[in-house]
Amino acid sequence: DNICSMWPARGGPAVADGVIYWAAGIWPSEGIFIEALRLDTGKRAWLNDTDGFRYMPQPHGGADAASGVSAQGHMVVDKGRVYLPTGRAVPAALNSADGKYQYFHLQKYGQLGGSSIAGFGTHFFNSGRLFNAQNGESQVQLSGPVARLGKNIASFSKGGIQVYRWAQKTKKDRKGKVIKFTGIEPLWKIDGVPGGTELIGSGSAIVSSGGDEVALIDSAGKTVEWKTKVKGTAHGLASAGGRLYVSTDEGFIYCFSGKDNAGQATEPARKRALPGHLETYADAADEILKNSGVREGYCLDLGCGDGSLAIELARQSSLKIYCIEEDPGLVEKARKRLDDAGLYGTRVVVHQASLNKTNYPKYLANLVVSGRSVTGGTVKIADDELTRLTRPWGGVVAIGKKGKLEIRRRGALAGAGSWTHQYSNPANTCCSEDAIVKGPLRMLWFRDADLPVPQRHGRGPAPLFHKGYLVVEGLNAVRATDAYNGRTIWEYSLPGILKAYNQDHLMGTAGTGSNLCTDGDSVYIHQKETCLRIDLATGKKLGEFRPPSTVAGKPGRWGYLAAVDGRLYGTIADSEHIVKWRYLKGEMKDLLTESKTFFSLDGKSGKLLWRYDAEHSIRHNAIAIGGGKVYLIDRKAAAIDTIKYRRAKGEKEIPHPGGAILALDATTGKVDWKKDKDIFGTMLALSAEKNILLMGYQPTRFRLPSEVGGRMAVFHTTDGYRVWDRKVDYASRPMLNDKTIYAEGGAWDLKTGVDREFKFKRSYGCGILAGGNNLMLFRSATMGYFDLADTKKTYNYGGLRLGCWVNAIPAGGIVLVPDASAGCKCSYLNQASLALETAD
């Protein structure tokens, strides 16, 4: 993990006709900057800084958003056009003379693309596919990497190199008229060549790499001149001055030449003169580490001096240290000392900047120190900059001389919300009550999507935020990340934990509820037979609990899961009630949505505190906890939802029978009240603060047949009195935000049911609304958010797609978006996990 610019310069430069073209920025909503500079003067020829914000069709059909181009890959200039690689999508084309937009077929070719481009005047290739340069229309797909070989085309195909030439061809248009067009036809092929990774043409030679092999082919003689192995996968090939350069994913660069060499040229590792241990700084580092308790994460050394404190902190801890110094002389000195110590660039970096305006990301530092302060040097750092840089929930400022160290530990952000359960809390409000984050949004951090997660149609568990930790469940592990800087803190291996969710059924947690929650200092995660208690801070296992036996005395299986104030709540799942997949198909036996028994355990010991055995069945979505009570609907399970349900010809569909709402004492399990008149709902949500219990449906895309929708009712939590009951149209799971119920389709006063103004619109996107006090998040082609606090409009954060249920949450004063796009073939520009903050 490293700090980089919000606008990384990934648009590799191209030079043509005395002009250099380059680009910066990968997130369209942050702005993409494409620039042309004159080589002789360095003056700007043109700048395109608007097409990142372009409102346009997105990769998924029917999806439009304010999300335009990105800059990711080597640019190509050819015949009056600049081709801009956009990462995972097809290239955009600009006019090379003025930078004006020509085309970007993001939706039309929504499952094509990549960063590799080869220009041929009237045509270009992108990741093996031939396109017409005039209009960007696709013509033909080749099987592997493509390179230019003079006027011809070379491509890797089925174990060899296939060379093509241009040819005039004919075809019939849609009206049957014969038309001429320029295409390609095979010229010659050579087999037995490694390939498939990268391919370039150099004069009459073709260079191909495949895995750890590289080969050079003489196109004139159509022979393999030589091939060799390298260490790692050979991703980069380049030729210049009669030499071939090969770079691998293991960090090696090889140079090959046709000239005879006396021997292999290597540069021996430089012997480093390690600075001696300076007692003052060694003692200071020891005191800082012991008093702060911070030994991992990001450390900022504001006013680092000559880097001595940074050297000692690096020696005594696992911190990654960023030094800031205003004095250019000290910057140079610190860099040299750190380089001599073998630490520069790997463990420690030095930047020159104002100590009061570092331009580093907000909330970055787990630890803030000052090397100059160790010896009593003057260091003036504004309090607001110190606060801005320090991570909430435990970030530490430790500045001063040995023995006079001032320690300042940052707590939670005032007004920050939490997201501890699937729908924010055990009350199912779908609202974190975060009062800090609001639009407009901008990037705080991003990282590779390196935790394998269930494919998006599997609707895996929502991410959680608790006490500064982002907890995400993957296919084979649960991971805790520092929510404020994206650093992995721990990972607990659970092979196959979400295997059942890695399918195209579009059910998942929409029916089962989550198997993951947090409470206090614990993470709870159930794996059918047992529930693990894991330490939130360390990832260490603290306990393992089995559910109680069924009424029949058989071993129980975990279904629903929640934790509140040290108590663990769960259900014994009904393994006979198996719902039908909502999309293509799925193995559903491990995706259970109904239970026969509700119970409570001690959250530390696992001791059974009480149980409620249902008269009929308890739907997992129809459980809400808060205000010292457990609310649930005891109702016959809906037969029409199941795989085995078959309706006889002419038979009326079996309705979902009504049931009863019960309020149970959360401590004892005793029934406080029960209402059994006209109980129609399939979900419950609770506002404990307002003493309101909402009953409704989850009438979303790919719903179960029993989710008929069209109605809501509200009960008073003290006695079950029905406050109001209305027929209303909505198309998402309801969200409770203070005094208002929000859903796609409308908003209603929580206490009266009266309509409230809510002009909500979004583009294509399944999934539900996840809100804070000031905004709500959802999929709207890309990531969408609705500004509740100010404009009452929908906006996009572009360049990525959300999952198909809940994976973007407003909590901790920020927006957290771990990747949930696995399995999607649509060429959204970026696939990453990230956090957003309110733009200043």
Model-inferred region functions:
Residues 1-3, 46-68, 106-113, 176-186, ...:
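Surface-exposed loop and turn segments in beta-propeller and other repeat-based domains
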Residues 39-41, 95-98, 133-136, 167-168, ...:
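Short loop/turn segments that connect beta-strands within beta-propeller blades
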Residues 379-395:
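A short glycine-rich, Lys/Arg-flanked "PGG" loop and its adjoining helix->strand segment in the class I
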Residues 4-35, 60-91, 105, 109-130, ...:
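Repeat-blade elements of multi-bladed beta-propeller folds
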